[in-house]
């Protein structure tokens, strides 16, 4: 949520910044409604002041034994008028809140401006792309011999785009998750296994709705709906909603391992088959609450952890600074970490690290007391650390051998009982 006071003070500048994300944005409706709200507040305060004066006159008249009937009627009329104004004010405030809730976060000043991902900038590349002495296989082709995934079984029970892991695929998935969780813990993150269902207001707080309402799975729970989380960012942010932290508590680092549920997975087409784009996947999520001065430090910390893991997994990767047209609704800055997938002949995102400034905390009401005792909104950051489906694809496709086997990254072997190679099921 954006600060209406800043919009009111510098409307042209705010609109210019927002149009870098969406050229169609106009702040005129917001400013017009804000003007109405302020006028109604003034009218309300004026009537309240008049009512107080009349109440004093009534008290004085009664003390002096003077008939106060007319004064009492005036107060009753004022009270009725005030009630109407207050109701109108509540309606206009709700409308203003709704308009503000659809405005994205401002992009940072150093973000490349573009309408889509074509404007993203590769800022770092690490590792050489693999050179094979044989025709490399797509991970679904490798799976025919490895027998670690079963999309057909999942399609029977749930539908297309839902994965089912089996045999050593289960062990490899949990090895990745355990490795990543231990990495977060070693870097001082507090670990969580949170609920997978959240209230609608928690999705609002993290910025997923109202703009993207309808894109999430939900279940009916009495008179309300609970939503399956699209990322643990939602619930980690929600844990501190409406809280007032102390400055000494910050920065506060959280990490969670959860399944994530996304409805849009099936829209990419046949090219992104298998695990490249699915409705359900595991992800370790990093989240931080900071002061404004700690924001950049936390960002670098998250980014370094992601790079550390990709380096230890010995996967070729690159970092891309996202343009305004490819950034999320809540982010002011995002760097994607992308791994090379030989089966796709392209780099694919396995982590997005984002700074969200005070955008989410204003929606969630998360504040802290600064050293002067003044209440301030915290800054929030989030980053995947990491998402497993494409990571597993990268491991399978980059480490495949001519006989269809796959070399296990050394860093994962302790979590697999020392297993060094995934052999085809018949070997």
Curated annotation (Swiss-Prot):
Signal peptide: none annotated. Catalyzes the attachment of serine to tRNA(Ser). Is also able to aminoacylate tRNA(Sec) with serine, to form the misacylated tRNA L-seryl-tRNA(Sec), which will be further converted into selenocysteinyl-tRNA(Sec). It comes from Chlamydia pneumoniae. GO terms for cellular component: cytoplasm. Its EC number is 6.1.1.11. Pfam families: Seryl_tRNA_N, tRNA-synt_2b. SUPFAM superfamilies: Class II aaRS and biotin synthetases (SSF55681), tRNA-binding arm (SSF46589). Consists of two distinct domains, a catalytic core and a N-terminal extension that is involved in tRNA binding. This is Serine--tRNA ligase. ATP binds at residues 262-264, 278, 349-352. The gene is serS.
């Amino acid at each position: 949520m954006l600060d209406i006071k800043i919009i009111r003070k510098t409307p042209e500048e705010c609109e210019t910044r927002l149009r870098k994300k969406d050229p169609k944005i106009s702040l005129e409706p917001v400013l017009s409604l804000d003007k109405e709200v302020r006028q109604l507040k003034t009218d309300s305060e004026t009537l309240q002041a008049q009512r107080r004066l009349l109440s004093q006159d009534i008290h004085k008249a009664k003390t002096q034994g003077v008939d106060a009937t007319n004064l009492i009627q005036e107060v009753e009329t004022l009270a009725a008028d005030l009630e109407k104004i207050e109701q109108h004010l509540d309606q206009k405030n709700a409308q203003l809140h709704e308009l503000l809730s659809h405005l994205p976060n401002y992009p940072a000043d150093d973000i490349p401006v573009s309408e889509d991902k074509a404007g993203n900038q590769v800022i770092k590349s690490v590792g050489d792309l693999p050179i094979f002495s044989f025709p490399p296989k797509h991970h679904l082709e490798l799976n025919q011999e490895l027998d670690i995934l079963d999309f057909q079984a999942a399609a029977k029970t749930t539908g297309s785009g839902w994965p089912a892991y089996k045999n050593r695929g289960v062990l490899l998935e949990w090895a990745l998750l355990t490795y990543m969780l231990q990495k977060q813990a070693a870097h001082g993150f507090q670990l969580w296994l949170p609920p997978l269902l959240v209230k609608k207001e928690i999705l609002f707080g993290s910025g997923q709705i109202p703009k993207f309402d309808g894109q999430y799975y939900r279940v009916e729970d009495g008179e309300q709906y609970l939503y399956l989380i699209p990322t643990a960012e939602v619930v980690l942010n929600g844990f501190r909603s409406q809280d007032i932290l102390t400055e000494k508590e910050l920065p506060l680092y959280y990490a969670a391992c959860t399944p994530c549920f996304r409805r849009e997975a099936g829209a990419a087409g046949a090219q992104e088959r298998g695990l490249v784009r699915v409705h359900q996947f595991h992800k370790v999520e990093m989240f931080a609450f900071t002061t404004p001065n700690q924001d950049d430090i936390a960002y670098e910390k998250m980014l370094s952890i992601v790079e550390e893991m990709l380096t230890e997994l010995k996967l070729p990767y690159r970092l891309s600074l996202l343009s305004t047209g490819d950034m999320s609704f809540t982010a002011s800055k995002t760097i994607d970490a992308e791994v090379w997938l030989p089966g796709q002949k392209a780099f694919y995102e396995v982590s997005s690290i984002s700074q969200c400034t005070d955008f989410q905390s204003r929606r969630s009401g998360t504040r802290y007391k600064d050293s002067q005792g003044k209440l301030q909104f915290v800054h929030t950051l989030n980053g995947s650390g990491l998402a497993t489906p494409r990571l597993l694809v990268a491991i399978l496709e980059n480490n495949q051998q001519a006989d269809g086997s796959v070399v296990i990254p050394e860093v994962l072997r302790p979590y697999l009982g020392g297993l060094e190679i995934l052999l085809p099921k018949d070997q």
